[in-house]
């Protein structure tokens, strides 16, 4: 799980204000940080299937948000993809 400080740094970097957690960019960045954390956990615990399922759920949620941005706000999509170094 990410700490409050990490989450606040993400909000400050990608959000429109200090309490902006609703924009797709902030949500994608938070999901990405959680995905990175769960990926590290699964490297140490490869048989933890409930965590693996949670990871797949997060990847799906992030993908849906990325698809939304790609369809409606292509420049914002390209910016967040490049900043987070996500594959296409």
UniProtKB/Swiss-Prot annotation:
Region spans: Disordered: 1-24
GO MF, one annotated term: rRNA binding
Gene Ontology BP terms: translation
Cellular component GO terms held in the UniProt record: cytosolic small ribosomal subunit
CDD domains on file: Ribosomal_S15p_S13e (cd00353)
Pfam families attached to this UniProt entry: Ribosomal_S15
InterPro entries: Ribosomal_uS15 (IPR000589), Ribosomal_uS15_bac-type (IPR005290), uS15_NS1_RNA-bd_sf (IPR009068)
Domain of life: Bacteria
Composition bias, Basic and acidic residues: 1-12
Keyword field: Ribonucleoprotein, Ribosomal protein, RNA-binding, rRNA-binding
Assembly behavior: Part of the 30S ribosomal subunit. Forms a bridge to the 50S subunit in the 70S ribosome, contacting the 23S rRNA.
Protein name stated in the entry: Small ribosomal subunit protein uS15
Gene label: rpsO
